[in-house]
């Protein structure tokens, strides 16, 4: 069984369906409310576990009900949560999504995801160094991603970086990642002076 460590975001998605978006100062009635598990990191962990991998999740949650919901969901999917840190006086990351008029508007609150730092990675290193693959995304601080990529490269641990959401990453350490999975928009952000064809070559 492949051992995968996912280092990344844990969110709850709060989705409101409405006929239109409210104007500034306006209150309107919505149609439906959905609360779902999210975060690119946690989503990757659940997907990998459901495909049969042995998965460990590394990240941060707040000391709140949403954090507990995330922990429960990960455990229900047989994911190791030993290296998820509960951060006092911090909210769990959330995405507030309005679906209206055929489109969506999203406000993301990083919350505890912003607390995923080098110490969180170091605490989980015993699991990371034994992994067949480490998966990372851009929903945690960029300096932490750089630290993960550099340290894993030095230890010959394979890293898959999903550079979403798009960000300006330093090519010097970006090239140390074993795999990068950008879409076309993210590829342009990573290599702004090259065409897609030039980058792939």
Indicate residue ranges for each PLM-predicted region.
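Residues that scaffold the ATP/ADP-binding catalytic core of kinase and kinase-like folds
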Residues: 15, 107, 189-190
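Conserved phosphate-binding/catalytic loop of the ribokinase/pfkB sugar-kinase fold
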Residues: 86-87, 97-133, 138
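A glycine-rich helix N-cap at a beta->alpha junction
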Residues: 73-89
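Glycine-rich phosphate/adenosyl-contacting loop at the front of the ribokinase-like
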Residues: 1-60, 65-69, 75-79
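Conserved phosphate/ATP/ADP-binding segment of small-molecule kinases
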Residues: 149-201
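Glycine- and other small-residue-rich loops at beta-strand/loop junctions that grip anionic moieties
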Residues: 59, 137-138, 162
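Short gly/ser/thr-rich secondary-structure transition/capping motifs
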Residues: 78, 114-119, 159-165
């Amino acid at each position: 069984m492949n051992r995968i460590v996912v280092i990344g975001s844990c969110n709850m998605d709060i989705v409101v369906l409405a006929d239109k978006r409210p104007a500034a100062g306006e209150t309107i009635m919505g149609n439906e409310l959905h609360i779902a598990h999210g975060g690119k990191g946690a989503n990757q962990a659940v997907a990998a576990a459901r495909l049969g991998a042995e998965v460990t999740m590394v990240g941060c949650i707040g000391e709140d009900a949403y954090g507990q919901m995330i922990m429960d969901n990960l455990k229900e999917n047989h994911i190791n949560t030993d290296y998820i840190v509960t951060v006092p006086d911090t909210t769990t990351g959330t995405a507030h999504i309005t679906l209206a008029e055929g489109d969506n508007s999203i406000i993301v609150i990083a919350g505890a995801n912003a607390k995923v730092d080098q110490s969180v990675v170091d605490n989980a290193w015993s699991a990371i160094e034994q992994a067949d693959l480490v998966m990372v995304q851009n929903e945690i601080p960029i300096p932490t991603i750089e630290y993960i990529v550099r340290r894993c490269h030095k230890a010959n641990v394979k890293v898959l970086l999903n550079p979403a959401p798009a960000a300006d990453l330093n090519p010097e350490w970006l090239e140390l990642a074993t795999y990068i999975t950008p879409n076309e928009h993210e590829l342009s952000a990573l290599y702004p002076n090259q065409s897609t064809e030039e980058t792939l070559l």
